[in-house]
Amino acid sequence: MEHERGGGGRGRGRGRGGGRGGGGGDGRGGGYGGAGGGGVGGRGGRGPPGGGGGRGYEPGGGRGYGGGGGGGGRGYGGGGGGGGYESGGGRGYGGGGRGYESGGGRGPGGGGRGHESGGGGGRGGNVWAQPGRGRGGAPAPAPAPAPAARRIQDEGAARSSGTVERIASTEVVRVQPPAPPVAVSRSGTRVPMRRPDGGGSVSKAKVKLLVNHFIVKYRQASTVFHYDIDIKLDISSPKASDKELSKGDFLTVKDELFKDESFRRLSSAVAYDGKRNLFTCAELPDGLFRVKVRSRTYIVSVEFKKKLPLSQLSELPVPREVLQGLDVIVREASSWRKIIIGQGFYSQGRSVPIGPDVVALKGTQQTLKCTQKGLILCVDYSVMPFRKAGPVLDLVQKSVRYLDYRTTLNKHQLDTLKNELKGQRVTVNHRRTKQKYIVKGLTDKPASQITFVDSESGQTKKLLDYYSQQYGKVIEYQMLPCLDLSKSKDKQNYVPIELCDLLEGQRYPKASLNRNSDKTLKEMALIPASSRKEEILELVNADDGPCRGEIAQQFGISLDVQMMEVTGRTLPPPSLKLGTSSGQPPKFNIDQPNCQWNLTRKRLAEGGVLQCWGVVDFSADSGQYALNGNMFIDKIVRKCCDLGVQMNRNPCIVQLLDMEVLSDPHQLFEELNKAKQAAASKKQKLQLLFCPMSDQHPGYKTLKLICETQLGIQTQCFLSFLANKQQGQDQYMSNLALKINGKIGGSNIQLFGESLPRISGAPYMFIGADVNHPSPGNVESPSIAAVVASVDQGASKYVPRIRAQPHRCEVIQHLGDMCKELIGVFEKRNRVKPQRIIYFRDGVSDGQFDMVLNEELADMEKAIKTKDYSPTITVIVAKKRHHTRLFPKDLNQQQTKNGNVLPGTVVDTGVVDPAAYDFYLCSHNGLIGTSRPTHYYSLLDEHGFASDDLQKLVYNLCFVFARCTKPVSLATPVYYADLAAYRGRLYYEGMMMSQPPPSSAASASSASSSGAGASDFRSFPALHEDLVDNMFFI
């Protein structure tokens, strides 16, 4: 129960007295104590005592220069081992040995500093060895021993609820050593290519732009000190448990440590990432410390790792650890009075109410990066919804309609409340405490029926009686469930809802916003480019803006508050190929600045044939929202025929259903199969079904699953009330016709060979790849990988392959097999294999470039290359999840209607990577909000693209997206891969919806994420053979 009790375990360490040695001569501070005993599980030295203390965190440690000496380990020669917590090790000549878990000398001839063991040997020892730095010195008197405990009593010290004491490793019952470094991906032979030239020069016009990048100023001569801080519960303390410590626990313990007089002078000059990395502008005392915070005791190891000179920021490539260290410092210097969510910093002083229990906070998204103009901080405007702080009971009353405290909640109400409250942070109001809890869930029973066994008396007590007797609280809403605030499985902590309060600063799920709140939030977020620029500048110049305050001053960093200015270029659009009619030439030139075109009196490049089609109308019983069927059929047939699609004017089947059918997977299958069989009875093959719906419905997922994996029917779903509208109806029908033609094998728009520089002289293929991951709260569902490939000369027809793979696996498994299949389709259609392949990869971070080159590309080459077939390959990564924005510098320069840069705006100097081959391209006409350019990286190029050629190729590929008559924001191969992966996600969710609900016992033991219990990705459905090579996903 909430009055938690518990006992810690006892640990025993065995040690035998070791040899004695003096303090370090000619060293810094001698040591922390006299030479002495063995470490945990260790034994005393076997060799003769050395001259000086080795560096360790137990008696015998120190920084003296001199021979081995004392301290926990096994010295087999020269002066004995210098044991100590995790590293220890003498720094003089000789030594080696084994300390607590690891150890090892640092001197020539000594063992290496190792993980789990040191070991003797020559210079360097094992793989973790570091060179020795000691030199011989005369023995010196041992320093006085440190006090056993030091209570903070200095009048100038901050108030503390605990104690900090330095301890020896022999006093630690159990502290696990740090895990060895783990590589993110397999190391390979390939690295991302460097920029081949100074950037492109081709353009319609050059434009002056402002970019939301701000120069970070720092002192070149400064040095940052990197420490590893390891915080664990002391299991010998009464409140010890096996629970994993939270980030809040780490921060609390770190703050308590820096109230101690040994650390307090640097309390305003420290940056901590909340995990293992701590950065300061001066040296810290290192060693083991026992820190007491309230009723818990922690063991804290502070170990020096490395000096990081900021002068290295001007080197190329910039050392990763220096950039990571400065990133932590900048985050710390930007967090004053802020709520931090990921890379976002939100100010409570800039809140706007958008609903009864939700506010929107304005803030920034910040990213530190190196560019050609130096170290910059990218600052973007951001809006995030947050819950209002207050009683949990208020939230319950708003979430549950017709709440009656005299009756229990029904299942629907209970599920609604669980979804609202799970994961929320609360505090209790029946006792004076600042302790915070995370809601694990709700009890199945109401508070009036909950009992527990008292740990002291062994008697069964009612929960309500406990709160009445212990705290004098009479629970009014006895029929409501309790919040489960348990921190471990063996200690239940159920608290009545009315005794809990929501903490401030908690993110509100966007999916839970009502329609009005969602609309208001979008209006705040999707502001015009000029307004976004002003918001960013206001946030950067604010008193609590980035890189402000004492921490920034201590580290000597500041921010130039002016946006960076760069020169961009506007690329010319390509010539497009349309269909011919009435003697029209097939070549079509775009002359509009916004690069849009219309299809009035024009035909599609290749019209498909739609002979057998039908209508399954789910809106038939929806009253005023029901489809006007006759009008729709007349309009869509006429539009398709005008555009060159050979469409039968009469449907072969029409079925009138209601929306409820979508909620029953079995009935839905029967109705759809009935349509297929009706066509078969007429000796026809059903190609496409129109499926109007009166509203968005989850059954859409099941419909796609059934038609595309079981029946082999393509579908075109749409909202009936939009098709009925007279205003804009012609454009709506045109948009439907574009999708229909693509699905039935037609081609809407094509590129000429001249629009594909350096590859059009031989058969070529564009491949796009992406991985769709489950939502953040989902811990079991598989990730969905999709690969698409072009199979025609006009780069407009694509074939997909979709696979499920393990949960959150980013590397595309079986990429080689999928590419081999796609090349086989290409060869079947063109009677030749592609000799040139352009591989576009979406959704990977900078740190995963090695994975793309040395895992995915290697898998592809292994599968497709043979003695007789070896195509050349270019690898391009497309990134949309960044916060760089481009703004026209002058209001009078040419721009879109809402102030965005024109389509085709490219930037490849100044704000790009100082070494990589990258560029920003804004290829679309942003109609709402501020346009986000796509950031392209070329990782490998076997075709020798110059910057102009590559930028032209990528931009031109944005014009062949089948669903619209304008360039899109992402190269079409990548866009299609994203759509195909999302379609695979719909299949999986539809499959979960079609399964019978689990039993109560099974559901109680399963995870609460969507799709729980169905993480076996091998059961993912395969596409129907009739659709496997079609563009059904557009």
UniProtKB/Swiss-Prot annotation:
Protein family (similarity comment): Belongs to the argonaute family. Ago subfamily.
Ranges where the Piwi domain occurs: 688-989
Organism field: Oryza sativa subsp. japonica
Disordered: region residues: 1-201
Flavoprotein listed as a keyword: no
Entries under InterPro entries matching the protein: ArgoL1, Argonaute_N, PAZ_dom, PAZ_dom_sf, Piwi, Piwi_ago-like, RNaseH-like_sf, RNaseH_sf
GO MF, one annotated term: RNA binding
Protein's GO biological process: regulatory ncRNA-mediated gene silencing
Name of the gene encoding the protein in the UniProt record: AGO2
Protein name per UniProt: Protein argonaute 2
Keyword Isomerase included in the entry's annotation: no
Role description: Probably involved in the RNA silencing pathway. May bind to short RNAs such as microRNAs (miRNAs) or short interfering RNAs (siRNAs), and represses the translation of mRNAs which are complementary to them.
Residue ranges constituting the PAZ domain according to the UniProt record: 391-504
GO CC list: cytoplasm; nucleus
